């Protein structure tokens, strides 16, 4: 059985990043998250320390690092490097190292720098470790989430106000999407996992835990809020009906359940920015991934950490890939804040309306507040990929780049 205190703690620690003024009524969270004994044994077998996992991967797959790095094509590389404008002797933080594409481009522009390479994914951390061997004076690899970055930096001796530039390349990497065992893609069958760092936290709920345990109203709220899915109720109903017959454990199984809620003609009617057909379950997968990995709250915490550790005049560059991320970045840079007293994210609202919520949780309504301006925008308008970039890397078609200088 899933260790319940972890689930409580994960949601109680969330900072609000859902910056809309309206908060949906989410219904009641189930009394506990159910997992089978088999799932528990699987979790127990996978328990390892963070560093050991990364080191073993490094030793066993050294010759495959170049191949892994090529799986992920960095987005808007020229724009990122231009906005960061690296100069000799400067110090940078890449908060989303991934396969290192942006970091390598920064080093090509100016090699006499120090760059801290952070990622929550042990696979990406192993790549950063490998790159640090090639650039021992420049690269400092770090493993952790945005919410852990401040502690990691302080432990490494980095003080607030140190960095000349910080990069955040948000969302899911191609390495994650293209590995069926990670459970991110609906096009490749695999276990319904979606955790970016599940090996580090065996008790962390998977996407399968979410779809098999939450009630219909909570599922619909997750799909509506994090996937901006207008058919959230219909999809949630289909999920609940399907799981009453058999557990939902595979990615393509979930994709088929979502598709089954619509007529065949509607499955590929949605179009992406390139006018290509997309599966009707795409937004469902996005919503579950964001929810499982706590991405929006992590983003908000990461932005605050970036601001704290940038020096005055330091540059922040953020690449987002859907409107939820971009909205948070935009409002943060514009100084539109919501004090913790008034913050109620979807997760916090779930806690408040369920038996998991504590008696002292704040129930006041959300109130938008504008904080003192802390940033000067480098570009007044958001930047998007050039046509050639989209042709070379269609996955980056929805990228939006915002950059600002700390005042």
Curated annotation (Swiss-Prot):
It is found in: Mitochondrion matrix. It comes from the Eukaryota. Belongs to the methyltransferase superfamily. RsmH family. This is 12S rRNA N(4)-cytidine methyltransferase METTL15. S-adenosyl-L-methionine binds at residues 100-102, 119, 146, 169, 176. It holds the Pfam family Methyltransf_5. InterPro entries: RsmH (IPR002903), SAM-dep_MeTrfase_MraW_recog (IPR023397), SAM-dependent_MTases_sf (IPR029063). GO terms for biological process: rRNA base methylation. It comes from Homo sapiens. It catalyses: cytidine(839) in 12S rRNA + S-adenosyl-L-methionine = N(4)-methylcytidine(839) in 12S rRNA + S-adenosyl-L-homocysteine + H(+). Its EC number is 2.1.1.-. Disulfide bonds: none annotated. The modification Phosphoserine is found at residue 358. Keywords: Methyltransferase, Mitochondrion, Phosphoprotein, S-adenosyl-L-methionine, Transferase, Transit peptide. GO terms for molecular function: rRNA (cytosine-N4-)-methyltransferase activity. Its main location: mitochondrion.
């Amino acid at each position: 059985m899933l260790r319940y205190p972890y689930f409580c703690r994960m949601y109680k620690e969330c900072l609000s990043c859902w910056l809309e003024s309206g908060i949906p009524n989410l219904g009641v969270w189930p009394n506990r998250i159910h997992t089978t004994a088999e799932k528990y044994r699987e979790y127990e077998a996978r328990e390892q320390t963070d560093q050991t996992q990364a080191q073993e991967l490094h030793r066993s797959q050294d010759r495959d690092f170049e191949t892994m790095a090529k799986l992920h094509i960095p987005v808007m590389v020229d724009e990122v490097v231009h906005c960061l404008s690296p100069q000799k002797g400067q110090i940078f933080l890449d908060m989303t190292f991934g396969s290192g594409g942006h970091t390598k481009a920064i080093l090509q522009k100016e090699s006499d720098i120090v760059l801290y390479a952070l990622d929550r994914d042990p696979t990406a951390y192993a790549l950063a470790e490998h790159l640090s061997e090639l650039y021992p004076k420049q690269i400092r690899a770090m493993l952790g989430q945005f919410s852990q970055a401040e502690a990691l930096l302080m432990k490494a001796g980095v003080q607030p106000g140190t960095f000349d530039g910080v990069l955040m390349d948000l969302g899911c990497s191609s390495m994650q999407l293209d590995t069926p065992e990670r459970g991110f893609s609906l096009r490749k069958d695999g276990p319904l996992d979606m955790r970016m760092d599940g090996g580090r936290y065996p008790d962390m709920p998977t996407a399968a835990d979410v779809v098999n345990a939450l009630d219909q109203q909570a599922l619909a709220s997750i799909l509506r809020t994090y996937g901006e899915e207008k058919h959230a109720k219909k999809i949630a109903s289909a999920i609940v009906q399907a799981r009453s017959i058999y557990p939902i454990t595979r990615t393509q199984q979930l994709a088929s359940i979502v598709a089954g809620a619509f007529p065949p003609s509607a499955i590929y009617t949605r179009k992406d920015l390139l006018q290509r057909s997309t599966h009707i379950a795409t937004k469902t997968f996005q919503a579950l991934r964001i929810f499982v990995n706590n991405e929006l709250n992590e983003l908000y915490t990461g932005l605050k950490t970036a601001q704290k550790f940038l020096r005055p005049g330091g540059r922040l560059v953020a690449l987002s890939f859907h409107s939820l991320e971009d909205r948070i970045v935009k409002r943060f840079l514009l100084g539109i804040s919501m004090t913790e007293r008034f913050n109620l994210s979807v997760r916090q609202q779930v806690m408040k309306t369920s038996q998991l919520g504590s008696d002292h949780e704040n129930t006041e309504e959300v109130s938008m507040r504008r904080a003192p301006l802390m940033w000067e925008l480098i570009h007044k308008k958001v930047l998007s990929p050039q046509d050639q970039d989209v042709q070379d890397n269609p996955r980056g078609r929805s990228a939006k780049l915002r950059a600002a200088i700390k005042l």
